[in-house]
């Protein structure tokens, strides 16, 4: 049984991800981190899901039972956990969140002592420990060595200072009217605070979490309401976060929702113009072909990697780069953060608007993207794609029609993601029907 997916362990709370799994997983991770322990402290944060209370208590039980002390900081963005784990010199950090998923899902993400997401090799080692009954039992400590847990409510200030330090000192947000959709999620306090302290006129949406409304018709996955408000209020720009605030969607002053690849392109160019861009930009294999053309036109190289912001960061480390991201809105400025941080991206885009004295639409309009169609097809089984009869011929036929293809399985669900890209949208729509029918027969019997 495999526990870890594309981004930590994730599943339906109370079913797959129940208190038993959370406690045992915390013990397994704690056993792994014990070998390199310095402070014997592990940081635990969460988003605003009601199930977070159950999972948090289970994690605390697991860690303290093997002798770890736990620092609980309550609802905070995922990037805040990455930052604070290193800043507070903890052995590791744990974030309880299912990111953009509905409230009934939850997840557990781990960070090492430097605030980095774990490699697949480390995740595999933790899985091996999880299934080793003897090792789990042997790790329990005597009564006098049981760890302690304490809750700290004032660490938000440290994170706010770090975020504000990413914004240019010679700029102010005083001339900007900004609408923030915080998705009833982890950024509901910190995002408005940061923008207000930097001088912006701030209108906040979806900032009343009740444990069940996170991401519900709001936030980065549902920016249509934000777009309506931006137009109605004649705001300069709108920013939509997801439940744990590690991704960002931008809405321009016309109410148009920006594609993440457009955002990547203009921010990369902004960094280059400032002399701050190191090496090549990193994007994922699903990035739009027009992004590469835009970057190359401006003398910027593009490297690609698998989907997942931890793979973006790994590629950045390998090529000596400091900027990259995903079409979905996970964007990494590694000079400022170890993971995607929606707040940092929002501030950098605001700085770009202010420094250029241009509207959001005129800036984002520089990148002319090609049409893409994505279908998430539910499937009965995940067969080896290389062994599916007729697939090679299908891809060759599409290639001959100047259609780029990417077919890949979801890391967490029984889905295959079918991506087609071409200059002709009508051709795409026609061919997508054929592709869907092909995979329905191949993977659903």
Curated annotation (Swiss-Prot):
The keyword Ribosomal protein does not apply. Keywords: Isomerase, Magnesium, Metal-binding, Phosphoprotein. Its cofactor is Mg(2+). Its EC number is 5.4.2.10. Pfam families: PGM_PMM_I (PF02878), PGM_PMM_II (PF02879), PGM_PMM_III (PF02880), PGM_PMM_IV (PF00408). SUPFAM superfamilies: Phosphoglucomutase, C-terminal domain, Phosphoglucomutase, first 3 domains. GO terms for cellular component: cytosol. Activated by phosphorylation. It comes from the Bacteria. The modification Phosphoserine is found at residue 99. It catalyses: alpha-D-glucosamine 1-phosphate = D-glucosamine 6-phosphate. Gene3D superfamilies: Alpha-D-Glucose-1,6-Bisphosphate, subunit A, domain 3, Alpha-D-phosphohexomutase, C-terminal domain. The active site is at residue 99. It is an enzyme of class 5 (isomerase). Mg(2+) binds at residues 99, 242, 244, 246. Binds 1 Mg(2+) ion per subunit. One of its GO terms (molecular function) is phosphomannomutase activity. GO terms for biological process: carbohydrate metabolic process; peptidoglycan biosynthetic process; UDP-N-acetylglucosamine biosynthetic process. Catalyzes the conversion of glucosamine-6-phosphate to glucosamine-1-phosphate. Belongs to the phosphohexose mutase family. HAMAP family: GlmM_B (MF_01554_B). This is Phosphoglucosamine mutase. It comes from Campylobacter jejuni subsp. doylei (strain ATCC BAA-1458 / RM4099 / 269.97). The gene is glmM.
């Amino acid at each position: 049984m495999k526990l870890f997916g594309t981004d930590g362990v994730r599943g339906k709370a109370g079913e797959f991800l129940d208190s038993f799994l959370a406690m045992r997983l915390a013990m397994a991770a704690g056993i792994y981190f014990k070998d390199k322990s310095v402070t014997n402290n592990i940081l635990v944060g969460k988003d605003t899901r009601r199930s977070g209370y159950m999972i948090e208590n289970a994690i605390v039980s697991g860690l303290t039972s093997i002798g770890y002390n736990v620092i609980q900081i309550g609802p905070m963005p995922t990037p805040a956990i990455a930052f604070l784990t290193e800043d507070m010199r903890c052995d590791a950090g744990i974030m309880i969140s299912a990111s953009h998923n509905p409230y009934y899902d939850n997840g557990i993400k781990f960070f090492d002592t430097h605030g980095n997401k774990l490699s697949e090799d480390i995740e595999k080692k933790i899985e091996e420990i999880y299934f080793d009954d003897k090792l789990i039992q042997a790790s329990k400590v005597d009564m006098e060595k049981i760890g302690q847990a304490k809750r700290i409510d004032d660490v938000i200030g440290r994170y706010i200072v770090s975020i504000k330090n990413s914004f240019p000192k010679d700029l102010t947000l005083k001339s900007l009217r900004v609408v923030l959709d915080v998705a009833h999620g982890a950024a509901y306090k910190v995002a408005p605070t940061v923008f207000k302290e930097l001088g912006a006129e701030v209108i906040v949406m979806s900032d009343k979490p009740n444990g069940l409304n996170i991401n519900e018709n709001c936030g980065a996955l549902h920016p249509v309401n934000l777009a309506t408000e931006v137009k109605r209020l004649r705001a300069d720009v709108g920013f939509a976060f997801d439940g744990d605030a590690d991704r960002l969607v931008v809405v321009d002053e016309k109410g148009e929702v920006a594609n993440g690849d457009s955002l990547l392109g203009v921010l990369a160019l902004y960094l280059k113009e400032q002399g701050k861009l190191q090496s090549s930009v990193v994007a994922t294999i699903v990035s739009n072909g027009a992004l590469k053309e835009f970057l190359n036109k401006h003398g910027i190289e593009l490297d690609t990697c698998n989907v997942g912001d931890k793979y973006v960061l790994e590629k950045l480390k390998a090529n000596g780069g400091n900027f990259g991201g995903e079409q979905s809105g996970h964007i990494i400025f590694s000079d400022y953060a170890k993971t995607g941080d929606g707040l940092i991206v929002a501030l950098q885009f605001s700085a770009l608007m202010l420094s250029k004295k241009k509207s959001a639409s005129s800036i984002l309009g520089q990148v002319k993207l090609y049409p893409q169609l994505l279908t998430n097809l539910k499937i009965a089984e995940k067969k080896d794609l290389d062994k599916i009869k007729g697939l090679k011929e299908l891809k060759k036929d599409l290639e001959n029609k100047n259609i780029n293809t990417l077919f890949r399985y979801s890391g967490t669900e029984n889905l295959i993601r079918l991506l087609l890209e071409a200059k002709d949208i009508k051709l795409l729509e026609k061919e997508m029907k054929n592709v869907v029918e092909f995979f329905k027969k191949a993977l659903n019997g």
